[in-house]
Amino acid sequence: DPFLLGEIATVHALSDIYASLCRPLFSLAIINLPETELSIQTNQLTHILAGALIAHSQAGVRVVGGHTSEGGNLSVGFAVTGSSTKLPSIIKVDKDEDLRIILTKPLGTGVIMAANWQLRAEAVSVDDAIANMRHSNLQAADIFMQHNIIAATDVTGFGLARHVQNLAMRVGIEGCIIDLTSLPLLSGVTSLFDAGITSSLHEQNQLAATVHDYDRHPSNLSAVLFDPQTSGGLLGVFAAKDAKNAINALIETGHRA
């Protein structure tokens, strides 16, 4: 669906700015159209831009130009420029401080899209994944900033484990404990992993992350650690005293944190 593709690509691209705790200002579109009849290309481009412009407008961001190319598969991306009113600071965390990591969206878009490609995904799972990918991280970023966020990123193609690992390195801690049963998941994800379905990037993500004891879990739930996400949620580090209020604020605003 070119309209949804344009919308989700926008939300995905803007998320990098929100994860930096900044505000997006404008973007440039990069669109590749398959070689086909001009009327089909025109229709695809029109629907892509319609979805993208609506999502940009909702975020208060302008599309100021872009580039199109032809050949291969239909693809859409945006180069986004943002700004911050705060000067960058060096992150310093006491190694003995009690910290929590908050994830603002459920996981599983990678495995659901892989299953859908194989015609093995339930409609409810696909619908849940699409709704999740369309959901902007703007409000979650605002909540993070209101509750003394220490550091943040967003969960995208590298999967949760690698992004948690990178975040831990940024704040100077040796590692994190992830309770698999506490992770928010999209509909049907556990069943898909139990059926042996994984995304094409799954194995690569597993090799790239340093994770201990994940294979001791009694089910295949640990596979979600390496599932690549499209338009995934924000991941934030908080002091334990601030994390509870941040979680409550996210849940009150409809986030499946």
Regions found by a protein language model. Name each.
Residues D1-K105, T109-V126:
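Glycine-rich phosphate/pyrophosphate-binding loop regions near the starts of catalytic domains
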Residues D96, S136-I149, S219:
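Short, hydrophobic/aliphatic alpha-helical segments
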Residues F3, V124-N132, I150-A151, L221-V224:
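Short pre-catalytic strand/loop immediately N-terminal to key active-site residues, enriched for Gly-Thr
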Residues E70, L107-G108, D128-S136, A152-T156, ...:
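Short, contiguous, pocket-lining structural segments
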Residues T10-V11, L49, R134-L138, S219:
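Short, well-ordered alpha-helical scaffold segments within catalytic/effector domains
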Residues E37-R62, S69-L74, Q146, A152-A257:
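Glycine-/charge-enriched secondary-structure boundary and capping motifs
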Residues L14-S20, N132-A140:
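Structured alpha-helical segments in the cores of large, soluble enzyme domains
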